[in-house]
Amino acid sequence: MLSPKKTKFRKQHRGRMKGSASKGNTIAFGDYALQATEPVWLTSRQIEATRRTITRYVRRGGKLWIRVFPDKPVTARPAETRMGSGKGAPEYWVAVIKPGHILFEITGVPQKTAQQAMKLASYKLPIKTKFIVRNTTES
């Protein structure tokens, strides 16, 4: 599972997910991509499950890029604990995703294969996504 090796602080505020993605919203590496259309916190487990699904479907062909990384710790209190006495310990890591952010990119496979792989991958994610193709006019 993905998680940072080292962070400056152990815990973070929850924050807000306002607006749409201004960075990471264009295809940079591959020919086909899966783009988020809703805001979400993607857990490292969800990212890993999606990665496995795509690599299993395309088998040995193609190259996959994961364009998101879970760098935000989410804390949780133990079950049946009274209120107070500070914030809970970090439980898992999430990637903050805004609408328009590219999640995965793929190349080296036919468009039909890439589209089916991304469709199967989208079932592992808790949001609506969109399959996009790199413009051939871009250089």
Swiss-Prot record:
Q: Specify where it is mainly localized.
A: plastid
Q: What Gene3D superfamilies does the record tag this protein with?
A: Ribosomal protein L10e/L16
Supply the alphabetized keyword list: Chloroplast, Plastid, Ribonucleoprotein, Ribosomal protein
Task: Write one Gene Ontology MF term.
Answer: structural constituent of ribosome
Q: Which SUPFAM superfamilies match?
A: Ribosomal protein L16p/L10e (SSF54686)
Q: Where is the composition biased (Basic residues)?
A: 1-17
Q: What does UniProt give as GO cellular component?
A: chloroplast; mitochondrial large ribosomal subunit
What single Pfam family name could you report for this chain, choosing any that match? Ribosomal_L16
- Give the location in the cell: Plastid, Chloroplast
Query: Which region ranges are annotated with the description Disordered?
Result: 1-23
Q: Name its GO BP terms in alphabetical order.
A: mitochondrial translation
InterPro entries cross-referenced by the UniProt entry:
Ribosomal_uL16, Ribosomal_uL16_bact-type, Ribosomal_uL16_CS, Ribosomal_uL16_dom, Ribosomal_uL16_sf
Domain of life according to the entry: Eukaryota
Signal peptide range equals none
Q: What is the annotated quaternary arrangement, including any partners?
A: Part of the 50S ribosomal subunit.
Q: Which HAMAP family match?
A: Ribosomal_uL16
Tell me its family: Belongs to the universal ribosomal protein uL16 family.
User: Which named protein is this?
Assistant: Large ribosomal subunit protein uL16c
The species is Pyropia yezoensis
Q: Which gene encodes it?
A: rpl16
